[in-house]
Amino acid sequence: MMFFAPLFGQKYYDDQWKKVSDNYKTGKYKSNLPIILEIQKQAMKDENINQLIRSLKAEFSISNQTYDDGDNDATSRFFKKLSTFGETLKGDQKLVYQVLLGEFFWDYYQNNSWEINQRTNFDNQDFAQIETWSKLDFKNFLIKNFSILNAEKDHLKKIKT
């Protein structure tokens, strides 16, 4: 019976992602958010880090495409959500999460570098407000993240995805 659980679980995820894909094709981006949040919930329950990260990326993409960020803090709220997920993970999942967290920050920097590179560096930067980070803040965060991962490189090599 345990052998079928992963197959059943994967079918659930495949079916949900197919719904998401179909909605994208028909322009129903916002309709995907409840599906994606349900995938996140199930992934947390199943401890399926790959599906969790995929759903988080999709949520971030939908939020950026469909919501007006009048307070200019949507990204900060999303990264706060990411950090709360990180607190619940352990072992290999935590390391994979750490890799993907760095990737999120790098992608955000790459997509917004034209604006970020114009900001002045401050000593008292509010690190909870990613929208105000300077190039130096991103550099410092990514160096710290890379150092954490570099210390675990032997362990990372053994992780099977």
PLM segments and residue spans:
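Extracytoplasmic/secretory-pathway proteins
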Residues: Y13-T161
